Swiss-Prot record:
Chain intervals for the UniProt region annotation (Disordered): 462-488
Any GO CC annotation of this UniProt entry: host cell nucleus
Functional note: Plays an essential for the replication of viral DNA. Presumably cleaves viral genomic dsRNA replicative form to initiate rolling circle replication.
InterPro entries, per database record: Helicase_SF3_ssDNA/RNA_vir, P-loop_NTPase
Alphabetic keyword roster: Host nucleus
An annotated Gene Ontology molecular function: RNA helicase activity
Subcellular location: Host nucleus
Main subcellular location: host cell
Gene3D superfamilies: 3.40.1310.20, P-loop containing nucleotide triphosphate hydrolases
Entry protein name: Replication-associated protein
Coiled coil: none
Length: 488
């Protein structure tokens, strides 16, 4: 008989069993397959079919799987007793344990028995002893592997595992032969050690991906690694998982820029508070603060590490006075479009915001005054991107200081309609600033470079600084410099 005489899935079951129970060779009844009426009765975990070995194979330990005819009666009284199969079990057998089980797929009754013979027995003799009982269908006989206590305990555990035992009487008790030389019992610690198998490479990859995906994409890699002991063990030194996490932002839904608001005026009047409240409100669904405050000290970088931009919905340009170039500003505030690509330390990212909040102590007319004074038409692209303008005066209408004591006590003036009426006219914006929040003189000239007037009439290059001798120069220095006696 060859491997092709049996279903392929039965062969795969063999591999699983041999790994689980510490059993080596599978030896089956050598009669033709058709003589076994129902191979589906075989337990999906226990029974397997493999090539037949030599009938003269010697074995001292084995696991026997038995099935029973439909006409078999009183199985609990005799089916697990070694005296039912051997004439002199006290001489032939050293240890014998087993139990009845139900196949989880077919619900057929069968039994697993672990046998330790007093001496080596040939396979043909063992097979004939079990086959001689007419009510028995011999499923298979598996040769034991190893003689250590752990190997034997694994085989015993497999045959008397209470999790697989038949749940109903009279089959719900494991059979431990009274003549056993060793009092074997089910060892839970050994079973736990056996079931904790090393995962395959494919399964390990799936576990890592699933664990990474369980964390918010905006978390830093350090936060993920130190979130739990499981994450530490799984991700320690795993650069592939780190690279995978860094690219998760790519699959996030892209936001469209909906609003650009400017809140300007006196300090301490609630401008930054508005930006914070907006970020908190939008973060109610995502579970985090959705406001990112631009740090101009980072230069062209939008942060790094835990301070980098991580997909927040609100970009806050705090204390803004034109620190971003006008071209970059227009990209950040392009209504109806998605955010541009920006640099972050050790990488890059894409802005994915929907709101821009600009807070400043300077009127918008002074943001890019150096550009607009030279080319007033450049003001129009800036003007049309602003959807709301709010002014925070230094004093209340009654003349008292505008110093809100709580978030609800903020006083501001909405100038959006007046802003829209400018129609991109920079001169009108300057007049508006002069009326409400005048620009400082240094604001008007701060963009002027040292040699802007180099070709104007009367321009003179500044003289370089000259070292001035101190009027109280020490006599020793005078002598060292001139060689003359300073006292004469």
């Amino acid at each position: 008989m060859t491997d092709n005489d049996y279903p392929f899935d039965m062969l795969s079951q063999l591999s699983r069993l041999s790994q689980m129970s510490g059993i080596e060779d599978i030896i089956i009844e050598t009669q033709p397959q058709e003589s076994i009426s129902d191979l589906n009765m075989i337990d999906s975990e226990a029974a397997s079919v493999a090539s037949v070995t030599n009938d003269r194979t010697l074995m001292r330990r084995c696991i026997v799987t038995l099935f029973f005819n439909d006409t078999a009666e009183n199985l609990a009284d005799w089916a697990l007793d070694p005296a039912s199969y051997f004439n002199e079990p006290e001489k032939d057998i050293k240890e014998w344990v087993g139990q009845f089980e139900l196949c989880p797929t077919t619900n057929h009754l069968h039994a697993h028995i672990h046998v330790h013979f007093a001496r080596q027995m040939r396979f043909q003799f063992i097979r004939d002893q079990f086959s001689a009982v007419s009510q028995i269908k011999l499923g298979d006989i598996k040769k034991g592997r190893g003689t250590s206590k752990h190997a034997v305990q694994c085989a015993v555990n497999y045959c008397i595992d209470p999790r697989k035992r038949h749940p109903e009487e009279p089959f719900n008790e494991a059979y431990l032969w009274p003549g056993n030389k060793t009092k074997w019992e089910f060892d839970q610690a050994c079973a736990d050690k056996q079931t904790k198998k090393k995962p395959t490479k494919e399964q390990l990859v799936k576990d890592k991906i699933a664990l990474v995906d369980s964390f918010p994409y905006h978390w830093t890699w350090d936060q993920i690694v130190h979130s739990s002991d499981e994450a530490k063990e799984l991700f320690f030194g795993c650069s592939a998982s780190e690279r995978y996490h860094k690219t998760r932002a790519v699959v996030q839904a892209r936001r469209v820029i909906e609003s650009v608001e400017i809140h300007y005026g006196a300090g301490g009047t609630g401008k930054s508070t508005f930006a914070r409240q907006l970020g908190t409100k939008l973060g109610e669904t995502s579970g985090r603060d959705e406001k990112y405050t631009r740090n101009y000290d980072d230069g062209n970088f939008w942060g790094g590490g835990i301070t980098k931009y991580a997909g927040e919905a609100v970009v806050h340009l705090e204390e803004f006075e034109g620190q971003e170039t006008l071209s970059k500003f227009k990209d950040i505030c392009e209504l109806g479009a998605s955010g541009p690509n920006v640099n972050v330390k050790n990488g890059g990212t894409t802005l994915n915001h929907s709101h821009v909040v600009i807070t400043s102590n300077t009127h918008p007319a002074g943001f890019y005054k150096g550009v607009w004074k030279g080319d007033p038409k450049q003001f129009a692209p800036f003007w049309r991107r602003i959807t709301k303008l709010v002014f925070y005066p230094a004093h209340l209408p009654d003349g008292s200081l505008n110093a809100p004591k709580c978030d609800e006590d903020v006083y501001s003036i909405d100038q959006t309609e007046e802003w829209k009426a400018l129609q991109g006219n920079y001169e009108g914006c300057l007049k508006m600033a002069e009326r409400d929040w005048a620009l400082r003189d240094d604001d008007l000239d701060s963009n002027k470079r040292p040699f802007d007037d180099a070709f104007s009439e009367g321009f003179v290059l500044p003289r370089p600084r000259q070292m001035q001798r101190s009027a109280t120069e020490h006599n020793l220095f005078q002598y060292a410099r001139s060689g003359r006696d300073p006292t004469s």
